[in-house]
Amino acid sequence: FMHVGLEQLGFNALLQLMIGVPLEMVHGVLRISLLYLAGVLAGSLTVSITDMRAPVVGGSGGVYALCSAHLANVVMNWAGMRCPYKLLRMVLALVCMSSEVGRAVWLRFSPPLPASGPQPSFMAHLAGAVVGVSMGLTILRSYEERLRDQCGWWVVLLAYGTFL
């Protein structure tokens, strides 16, 4: 249970509640749990490969998987959603994600304070976003699912397993 600071802890908790809970209500606990854990795993593996000296703290990979899966869900079910604020929801999610990634990049490359240790990496955020979009388009339910979408699900799942 480590985070960079109260800002990251609060931001991650807020996004998990605002985005994760509605996604769970629509798509079920199992799918969203798998999505979140895949984002955390991909974020951790990406940091261990690309930025080996940076510590991995927090659940940003999972949070970004949830956020980008939410964006994929809105795009995938655009016509079937009855919410009049679809575009506003997407813009707000993108602004929140961009501001947190910008903060993480700033913390990583700014000179550390004398009392602080190495700054955490931002690569977990990016890996979580990639996992969220790719898995969100495949494992989340489409309101108008077609056979070609089911075939695409198996192809992306196989590719995802291969890359892990």
From Swiss-Prot:
It catalyses: Cleaves type-1 transmembrane domains using a catalytic dyad composed of serine and histidine that are contributed by different transmembrane domains. Its EC number is 3.4.21.105. Keywords: Hydrolase, Membrane, Protease, Serine protease, Transmembrane, Transmembrane helix. The keyword Transmembrane applies. It is a multi-pass membrane protein. GO terms for molecular function: serine-type endopeptidase activity. The keyword Transmembrane helix applies. The active site is at residues 60, 125. Disulfide bonds: none annotated. It is found in: Membrane. GO terms for cellular component: membrane. It comes from the Eukaryota. Its main location: membrane. One of its GO terms (biological process) is proteolysis. SUPFAM superfamilies: Rhomboid-like. InterPro entries: Peptidase_S54_rhomboid_dom (IPR022764), Rhomboid-like_sf (IPR035952), Rhomboid_IM_Serine_Proteases (IPR051739). The chain crosses the membrane at residues 10-30, 32-52, 56-76, 120-140. Belongs to the peptidase S54 family. PANTHER family: RHOMBOID-RELATED PROTEIN, RHOMBOID-RELATED PROTEIN 1. May be involved in regulated intramembrane proteolysis and the subsequent release of functional polypeptides from their membrane anchors. This is Rhomboid-related protein 1.
